[in-house]
Each structure stands twice: as C-alpha cells, then as structure tokens.
Amino acid sequence: VKIGNDGMNFPVWFLSLKDLYGNLLKIKEDSAQVQVAALRDAFYKARRSDASEEIPLSYDIRELCSLLEAENALEIETGEYYKTGDKTGMPKTVKGELNGKLTSLIQLLQDKMRDSRYKFMFSPKGENYLTFFLEKVLGTGAGSVKVIDLSSVPNDMLPTVVAVTARLLYRGQLTQTKENVIPLTIVCDEAHNYIPAGGINLTASQRRLLDVFETIAKEGRKFGVSLLVVSQRPSELNRTILAQCANHIVLKLSNDIDKQMIQGILPEGSKGIMDSVNLFRPGDCL
C-alpha cells in the first residue's frame, strides 16, 4: 500500500487540530496563540461537530480557509451612519478583533494547498474515504499482511503520516466489539527513525508521534493491537516503549552502547551471553 501523490490519498481531515497547525503549518502554539485560537474555531465550524479533534471527520479545507479569510476581513457596524461625503447614508464600521491578524496563517495554508508535493493531502475525498483507507491498509480477514510504502511522502510530513496512520489503526480497533476484533500487529521497521529516545531534543511532531506509539505500547494489548519494534540501533529507541516489550529477539550486535542497553533488560547472570552476540552468524539470535 503506497501513500502519496503516486499512491493513496491521505486527506488533511485525517489530521488532528494539533497535527494541522503544529506539523503541517509549523506553527508554535505558545508564540501564535491568536492564530491557533482562530484556526481552532474555524476547524470545528468546518467539521460541524464538537467531537474530539483526534476523531477524523470529513470537512472541506477550502471552507476552513474561507472562514479564516472572513474573520481576517471582518468589519463590524457601529450602528451609526455617515452624514456627509461619498459614504453618506452608509453604516460606519470598525475592524473586527482578528481583522488583519490572520494574513500570515492564511498564506501558510494556501501555500501548502498550492504545493504539488502535498497534493495527496488536499485532493477532496468524502467521508466514506476513511473506511476505504483502513480496508486497504488492513486488508481483509485474518492473516493479511500489508507493507505501507511512505517513500512518496514529503520528509517534513513523514512523522505525522506515520503517527496518524498508527492512531487511525488503533482507534479502528477501539470501535470493534470483542467478538469482532482481529488481532493487529504493527511492525515498526528501522524504528529508531521515528520512535527515538531523544528526550528534550525532540521536535513537537516527533513528540506527538511518540505519544501515539507509547499509548499503543501501554494500552494496545487490551484491544488486540501489538507492536513489533525492529531496529539495528536499540540504544536509540524510546525507553518507555522498550519497557513495554514483553519479548526481545537479539541478533548480532557489535556496538558496545547497544549491547549495554540490551544487557539492562536481560535477567542477571546473562552477561556472558551478551559478550558473544558480536560473534553471531546470520540467522543466530538470542
């Protein structure tokens, strides 16, 4: 399954409000509170629902943009009228609270909509597209295996598309009755690239990405969702997620930092085994 301009669309309404302003538009909430508040108001109006922002509901991004433009140009009648000049008889107005303050936000959004790299996010898709998307990603019936190809997704949106896809899969499982749940394993290959240790050095989009996978690691088993975390650099993986892993498969390791990290999760008395992992042959594992 390929996501991108030469694959499946990933409509912008899949994104939560925080993904929209923080990841797509790269707006920091603490330094642009007025713009974020205006975007939040337009977001819920366009969705015509006050449901949680993380519940994907179809809306037209062009309508959202029009709502912002209307606020940016709003003038309010004072109740008085011009008595002389060219405007005689016309109502007097004052600028609305947000008049002229949303220009940069609107420009950011319009630039993204015009950028051909993001066409797969702004091609209109109806409300039934989410069901179609999940069916394509999950396949049909037990035993189905799908590889999600993200090579066509712009690098700046890659963490967001990964996080939102994982969140959609997880939420899809939450809505199933216990009798209808089909166990789902999400295989995270080269996981250190998007489930990093990082700490305070993480970007906002990386932090939101981690939040999704930490939730799945902690709560997923209750709803039939498990993670298979694969990495050649285990020392660079998020510790919270690693701590939730019940089973570990260790292949050949040469890096001392990686070996020390693995040693920390093994039972006492197993140091001798770790000393030999750099001698493993292809196919050998612990």
Write out the residue ranges for each language-model feature.
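Conserved ATP-driven motor cores of ASCE-family P-loop NTPases powering translocation/secretion/packaging/pilus
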Residues: K26, L209-L210, E214-L286
